[in-house]
Design a protein with these regions (language model features):
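Glycine-rich phosphate/pyrophosphate-binding beta-alpha loops
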Residues: 201, 260, 281-287, 379-391
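C-terminal active-site "lid" helix and adjoining low-complexity regulatory extension at the edge
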Residues: 5-9, 322-350, 354-359, 368-431
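Protein kinase-like catalytic core scaffold
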Residues: 191, 274-276, 374-376
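Active-site nucleotide/adenylate-binding loops and adjacent lid/helix of ATP-dependent enzymes
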Residues: 138-261, 266-270, 431
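Intrinsically disordered, low-structural-confidence terminal and linker regions
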Residues: 1-62, 428-431
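Conserved N-proximal alpha/beta basic substrate-recognition cap immediately N-terminal to
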Residues: 55-186, 199, 349
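Hydrophobic residues embedded in beta-strands of well-ordered beta-sheets
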Residues: 213-214, 273, 309, 373-374
Length: 431
């Protein structure tokens, strides 16, 4: 990993410590459901018991920075987004700033998440219902991790396992690495190239075929040898795939990148995968490579019942776009549109999870083509911001919390006094 990557990782973990402090102190006292209370009690126990010396150092550093980082983050994002929210909703800058501070102490809401989760609207009532990134990335995910480690994050092995089981998945055409030469030729078609391991669309490139064994990324046109050399010079293994073209009905919903469904599945109480939630991701503006919302893309809610789309937005940490019923680049209608092959998309997500049954929670990226849905990849630590951005009530008051609490209980992490409690949750499509 590069020095910049290490610094970013350390900063991210420090933010998790800062955001997690109020949650750990409250130990679920303001949780909206018994399931959420159990999750937060488990998280609190883990928060104060670092696994490694490095984790202990990060805990101390994060606690020291709380009095500085929290007001500075609130100030920065108020300056960035506050005038826009004031114009749209009439809430003043001081009111937004003060509410961010109050919601930090009440629910661990730091800077950008106040705007990501639209907590400038009914924040005090809604904030405790959201499952925070710090709770999953620095807590619960580690406790839910399986021991066998199926190759979900290894893109080539992932594709091979899916192909062997007859699950439709984008194939790996070649892996390019200067340490281990792949003798396969590049397929003479449009290409999508990304790091062998990685997430968030970082490092991905799109190369369109412009002639026999020549490709262009919109700025450069290269032949096969030059293109292979470019990939080898990346300093890390790169996977080459044929670029997937979207279903014709979905082409108006993208500025060029292939749009995908992010489908969240989790193993239920009987050991069967269950579809929990889904969003649809789209590119807009100058982005023609990836649809990831963290890379500046759009997303919208998908009704599990019939595959209809809700209103769209970006991640929300930048409030300029806001919410829209139409695609901001193409003008095509988003809200109310029904995804093609929706029953098949749901079936594919469930079936794929059976191939990686040691993973309790998986986020699937699924493209919908003219021939039906096809898996792009699976994510072992799925991002909750992407899903909860489009929810009025968060995952703590949802089926997902019930399943997480059940698995924590089954693994012995939940205190005995909570084991007989019944949990009341809201189904996703009730939102």
């Amino acid at each position: 990993m590069s020095i910049g990557g290490r610094i970013a990782g350390e900063l991210e973990r420090t933010i998790y410590v800062i955001a997690g402090l109020p949650i750990a102190l409250r130990r679920g006292s303001n949780a909206p459901t018994v399931a959420a209370r159990d999750i937060r009690r488990v998280y609190a126990s883990r928060y104060w018991r670092p696994d490694r010396p490095r984790d202990g150092i990060e805990l101390v550093v994060g606690l020291i920075l709380v009095p500085i980082a929290v007001p500075l983050a609130a100030l920065w994002f108020t300056i960035k987004n506050g005038p826009i929210i004031r114009q749209r909703e009439g809430k003043g800058l001081l009111a937004q700033f003060g509410e961010q501070l109050r919601l930090y102490f009440a629910a661990g809401i730091v800077g950008p998440w106040y705007y990501i989760l639209s907590l400038h609207r009914d924040g005090p009532q809604r904030a405790p219902t959201f499952l925070q990134r710090c709770e999953t990335k620095r807590g619960i995910y580690a406790l839910l991790r399986g021991k066998t480690g199926s190759p979900l994050g290894e893109k080539r092995k992932f594709a091979e396992r899916c192909a062997a089981a007859g699950v439709r998945c984008v194939a790996c055409e070649a892996v390019i690495d200067r340490k281990a030469m792949d003798t396969a030729e590049l397929p003479d078609c449009d290409l999508f190239v990304k790091p062998l391991t990685g997430s968030g669309g970082r490092g991905a490139e799109r190369w369109d075929r412009v002639g026999r064994r020549h490709w262009s990324n919109g700025k450069l046109t290269l032949g096969e040898t030059a293109l292979m050399d470019r990939f080898r010079d990346k300093g890390r293994p790169m996977i080459v795939q044929k670029r997937v073209r979207p279903h014709p009905a979905l082409e108006p919903l993208t500025s060029g990148a292939t749009p995908t469904v992010r489908a969240l599945t989790m193993v239920d109480e009987q050991g069967r995968p269950e579809l929990i939630a889904a969003v649809f991701r789209m590119s807009f503006g100058a982005n023609r490579t990836v649809d990831n919302i963290h890379a500046g893309g759009l997303a919208c809610w998908v009704s599990l019942a019939d595959g209809r789309l809700g209103r769209a937005s970006n991640l929300g940490s930048d409030a300029r776009l806001g919410w829209t019923s139409d695609h901001p680049s193409t003008g095509a209608r988003i809200e109310g549109r029904q995804l093609p092959f929706w029953p098949e998309v749901k079936e594919l997500a469930i079936r794929a999870h059976t191939l990686f049954a040691d993973r309790l929670l998986i986020g699937w990226d699924i493209a919908i083509t003219e021939d039906g849905p096809i898996l792009i990849e699976g994510n072992r630590g799925p991002d909750m911001d992407l899903m909860q951005r489009f929810m009025d009530i968060g995952f703590c008051d949802h089926r997902l919390a019930e399943l997480i609490a059940w698995h924590l209980r089954a693994r012995g992490y939940v205190p005995n006094d909570a084991q007989a409690s019944k949990m009341s949750v809201v189904r996703v499509d009730a939102q």
